[in-house]
Swiss-Prot record:
Belongs to the lyssavirus protein P family. A motif (Nuclear export signal) lies at residues 49-58. InterPro entries: PP_M1-like, PP_M1_C, RABV_P-like_C. A motif (Nuclear localization signal) lies at residues 211-214. Pfam families: PP_M1. Residues 138-172 are annotated as: DYNLL1 and DYNLL2 binding. GO terms for cellular component: host cell; host cell cytoplasm; host cell nucleus; virion component. Residues 133-176 are annotated as: Disordered. This is Phosphoprotein.
């Protein structure tokens, strides 16, 4: 009788798939419960209404009065919705920014590049501010008197940022402890730190948030892992990803970033489960190969 041998790595990969499937089912069930929360209340039946309410009827005179009340209520609603001239214009600006954010998300879903969307959005915001927040008369002398203070604050902020950048990040410390090769220069090519770079990194990570990547396991096999299993906020993932050498430069140029390397970096610093599963030496070599391949393109 022939025997069938099963590769242990295939079993582990199957178990990982089952675990991810269970997590997906739980997430779908939670979303369904949240979406149906308004249906869990007890419905109101007409038969259960008080006896007095069944006897109500409206005369023509009462109908006319009711129409006047409705018109007054509509007028009051408009007054409440519209802002008075004396109210803070910053609230209008906040509402405008909220609408801009919704528009950016829609454009990104349609497939447009974020850098192009952001450049157009910046111009629109600048024009909005210049129209709705004109400089009041007599402000020039006030601005001159505050220029020196602004420069001093800017210098202090720059010094604080330089001190923070000089300190090793949590991900870098964990990677070095995990026998990372010394050939990786952890602090190189990460000087350009602006919002457009962060947005580009976040865009690429979000596109592959549920994609599974192969990583070497301690049992001489492989296991699958993705960004969803980190259970981290996207902003926190982007902050950790910026510490990977070369990522900010690639994002600034609009090039693809090594997502498997970024995932391994962030997971090694923040996921205990990942640390228990992964073979650190092989992971370090894979991360180095990914970095070399992407930065040489």
């Amino acid at each position: 009788m022939s025997k069938i041998f099963v590769n242990p790595s295939a079993i582990r990969a199957g178990l990982a798939d089952l675990e991810m499937a269970e997590e997906t089912v739980d997430l779908i069930n939670r979303n369904i419960e949240d979406n149906q929360a308004h249906l869990q209340g007890e419905p109101i039946e007409v038969d259960n209404l008080p006896e007095d309410m069944r006897q109500f009827h409206l005369d023509d005179e009462k109908l006319s009065n009711l129409g006047e009340m409705v018109r007054v209520g509509e007028g009051k609603y408009r007054e409440d919705f519209q802002m008075n001239e004396g109210e803070d214009p910053n609230l209008l600006f906040q509402s405008y920014l909220d609408n801009v954010g919704v528009q950016i998300v829609r454009q990104m879903r349609s497939g447009e590049r974020f850098l192009k969307i952001w450049s157009q959005t910046v111009e629109e915001i600048i024009s909005y501010v210049s129209v709705n927040f004109p400089n009041p008369p007599g402000r020039s002398s006030e601005d001159k008197s505050t220029q020196t203070t602004g420069r001093e604050l800017k210098k202090e902020t720059t010094s604080i940022l330089s001190q923070r950048e000089s300190q090793p990040s949590k991900a870098g410390m964990v990677a070095q402890v995990a026998s990372g090769p010394p050939s990786l220069e952890w602090s190189a090519t990460n000087g350009e730190d602006d919002l457009s770079v962060e947005a580009e990194i976040a865009h690429q990570i979000a596109e592959s948030f549920s994609k599974k990547y192969k990583f070497p396991s301690r049992s001489s096999g492989i296991f699958l892992y993705n960004f969803e299993q980190l259970e981290m906020n996207l902003d926190d993932i982007v902050k950790e990803a910026k510490n990977v050498p070369g990522v900010t430069r690639l994002a600034h140029d609009g090039s693809k970033i090594p997502l498997r390397c970024v995932l391994g970096w962030v997971a090694l610093a923040n996921s205990k489960k990942f640390q228990l599963l992964v073979e650190a030496d092989k992971l370090s070599k894979i991360m180095q190969d990914d970095l070399d391949r992407y930065t040489s393109c």
